[in-house]
Regions:
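Bacterial N-terminal signal peptides that target proteins for export
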Residues: 1-7
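Short, linear, compositionally biased motifs with a strong N-terminal bias
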Residues: 12-13
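C-terminal motif of bacterial Sec signal peptides marking the signal peptidase cleavage site
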Residues: 16-18
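Conserved functional acidic sites
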Residues: 22-233
């Protein structure tokens, strides 16, 4: 009986080991190394799906949790040095039912060699009833934190990469799931759009979907759709 139990336990061990191996094989791997030393960074630039030029603005609207939500993204005429890299400041202003819920100042730089846009962190003000309540989600690519990739200069379906690399604070990552989508919003109709799925190991069950149009940028963020774009006057 003892020998039989030993064989049973051994079989279970092998089974668990094989399952673990199969699980590891199926786990998605996201790139977190981008050879930034080969980049000459600029605070302005653009690629097919992202415009990093002062004054450029996107406005998206829609309903989230049955509440009217508005997101205004503006490339500011401001820069900020993060580490030894001068970055461009991009403000995101989100409101729900006309009340501001979040204002973030995001720091991006353009790699002239690859046309990729890299993300160097953000400062965040979260609001409730018109008052700042916390700065949750804020991080900078300094110390143990590293810059992430916001938009590849040559995106390919299946490419997986980290957008934020701040362990325990911000670890958003993206997978390009399609290039060639068609979408229509009140601002226009577009073809050959880029679709990505965003996840984070900090909240494994959460998923978000975004779409980018050639020559425009972000046109869909969850339930929010582009209603206005161009250079703000």
């Amino acid at each position: 009986m003892l020998i039989q139990n030993v064989f049973v336990l051994a079989g279970l061990s092998v089974s668990f080991y094989c399952c673990a191996q199969e699980k590891n094989k199926s786990a998605k791997i996201f790139t977190d190394t981008f050879n930034l030393d080969s980049c000459s960074f600029s605070t302005t630039g653009r690629n097919q799906f992202f415009i990093l030029e002062p004054g450029y603005q996107l406005t998206l609207e829609g309903k989230e949790d049955n509440e009217a939500t508005k997101l205004v993204i503006t490339v500011l005429d401001e820069t900020k040095k993060v580490g030894n890299i001068e970055t461009r400041v991009v403000e995101e202003n989100e409101s729900v039912n006309g009340q501001t819920v979040e204002i973030s100042r995001n720091y991006f730089a353009f790699c002239q060699q690859t046309n990729s846009i890299f993300y160097f962190g953000e400062e965040v003000d979260n609001y409730k009833n018109g008052k700042i309540i916390n700065h949750e989600g804020a991080w900078l690519a300094e110390g143990k934190n590293k810059p992430g990739l916001m938009m590849a200069g040559q995106p390919e379906v299946g490419y997986r990469y980290y957008q934020e690399i701040a362990p325990g604070i911000a670890m958003d990552r993206a997978e390009i799931i399609s290039i060639g989508e068609e979408i229509k919003t009140s601002a226009g109709s577009w073809e050959n759009c880029l679709a990505i799925e965003e996840t984070t190991p900090l909240s494994p069950k959460e998923k978000e979907y975004k779409m980018y149009a050639p020559g425009i940028g972000l046109i869909k963020d969850g339930n929010l759709l582009l209603v206005k774009y161009g250079f703000a006057k």
